Amino acid sequence: MASSRKTRKLGRKIGRKIGRKLERQQGGIRRTKGNPSKGKARKPQTTLADAPGPNQCFPRRGHVYDGVCLPLDVLEKVSGKLGLAAASASQTKRALFSQIAKALGVDAMKQRSVLEAMPLPAAEKTALAAEWLRPAQPAAWVSDPDMWLDTVNIRDVMMQYEKGRDDFTFLGPYPIDFAAAEDSGPGRAGTSDRCLIGEMCGLDLKTSKDYIGIIYNLDPHYKSGSHWVANFINRPAKTCYYFDSYGMRPPHRVYRFMQWLTIQMPGMELGWNGRKFQFSDSECGMYSMYFIDRMLAGEPFLKFCRRAPPDKFMLDMRDWFYST
């Protein structure tokens, strides 16, 4: 971004990764007269083929899970401990896992629950969950299945994508005032020469990884959160896309950031969706993560916008992005 007075905030010296303690934020769309919760019915264009990577399994690039997250040697060890019949050469990993789940009296669709019921030391189960499973689904979702996602819910999922791919960096989730002075707050602009989020203000596309995903909350850092939106930067393709499940244009601070990237990489294409995806009041966090997942999977941005997966699909994907 140019070093003019209008854009000096993003040219500040890089401070700490997070210059100060940030409010744990949530995101959703509050229903108002101008924000209807229902829209026109549309034909579904999204199927399980468009699901975000492996179901409940750690999204490790290039790894094939065959429907079961845990490795075969762990399943064979547990099978022996349970006294089950030895697995035959033709028995699939999925069949063995189902056999174990049945013996433990646990739904085989709930891979974390099966792991937790296995006769293994607690420390080993914790290590296996961290290596092979998606983050645990919050217990509060049982009674409130469409609860707004918060900062921690999103970070836990997206950091697995960063760990599972050596060509991807996740930034966030960050508040919309990421470029403000470190000592800014309600009613004060701040005078510090350090940026609130140093890794955003100091992002260098020349040295960055090929793909960068960013999730923002439209509230500033001192508020509790309002709505989640996202950016995806594809360095090899020289593109930067903005996604808002409500179909709104990038807010000024995000658009300035995107323009700054074009100064670093002349010819970079900027784009955003004009179509509204979300008609409920709760799935903006899921939409933002799903958008980044699909961009990493190579889905063209225009196709993604035309497909516009519905709220119901996003709600179902909570059992996909999080292990139960």
Where are the language model's segments positioned?
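Cysteine protease catalytic domains with a Cys-His-Asp triad
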Residues: 38-229, 235-240
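Exposed alpha-helical structural elements
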Residues: 153-157, 253-257, 312, 316
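Cysteine protease-like catalytic core of ubiquitin/ubiquitin-like
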Residues: 205-303
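Residues that form generic nucleotide/phosphate-binding pockets
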Residues: 157-161, 257-264, 320
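Alpha-helix boundary/capping residues
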Residues: 161-164, 261, 291, 308
